[in-house]
Amino acid sequence: MNASELLHRHLDQCPLVAIIRGVTPDEAEAIGDAIYESGIRIIEVPLNSPDPLKSIERLAAKFGERMLVGGGTVLDAEQVRAVKESGGRLIVSPNTNVEVIEETVDAGLVASPGYFTPSDAFDALEAGATALKLFPAEAASPAVLKAQRAVLPKDVPILIVGGVKPDSLRPWIDAGANGFGLGGGLYQPGQSPAETLEKARAYVAGLKA
């Protein structure tokens, strides 16, 4: 299964990515259980979390093929390699860094770099990006996405990240979004698994609104 097939397999089950910034390794598995129970099948552990590679390792070992687990805020090629060694299969960046994308592609992992302009997007795609992350979405709009969708390849998934709320998903979907990255609205450091499950279910319900 190549990177694109891997991503689509999990996005097709639920087009949401749980970004659990600030989670600790001791919390990761219980938080992962809550996210899995909600129906979400993709987890991103930002690398500016406490001991993130250990959290990725534990989540990847626990869920195996049932979830797509990886690292976020990946800023250089060395971090790509570290995530892979920890069992992660997804690399998410806040920016369009060709070196990071190419290293991710060479490693056979899913590459989801951040972009904001069409120039960013085409640079990322030329480097081999699997998907594109519109970030920060708070500074864009569904109208902006719709205009970008008119020129970007139709088969490239675009994920919306930044300020996404359960009641704001539908306009983005109608504009051409394929999924969403859920950050602070889903998880805050120290949050309980029960609260995480409640918030995750609200986002899953928002997809059907």
Regions found by a protein language model. Give the residues of each.
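Glycine-enriched alpha-helix->loop->beta-strand junction motifs that scaffold or abut catalytic
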Residues: 36-41, 63-66, 85-91, 106-112, ...
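Catalytic cores of alpha/beta
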Residues: 76-86, 119-127, 164-180
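Conserved N-terminal beta1-alpha1 strand-loop-helix module at the mouth
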Residues: 1-86, 96, 106, 166-167, ...
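Histidine/lysine/aspartate-rich catalytic loop segments that bind and position anionic ligands
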Residues: 90, 94-140
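Short, ordered loop/turn segments at secondary-structure junctions
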Residues: 47-48, 74, 96-98, 116-117, ...
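Hydrophobic faces of well-ordered beta-strands that scaffold small-molecule active sites
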Residues: 16-20, 43-45, 69-72, 91-92, ...
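Glycine-rich phosphate-binding active-site loops on the catalytic face of alpha/beta enzymes
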Residues: 90, 94-100, 133-142, 175-199
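A charged, well-structured terminal subsegment
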Residues: 145-152
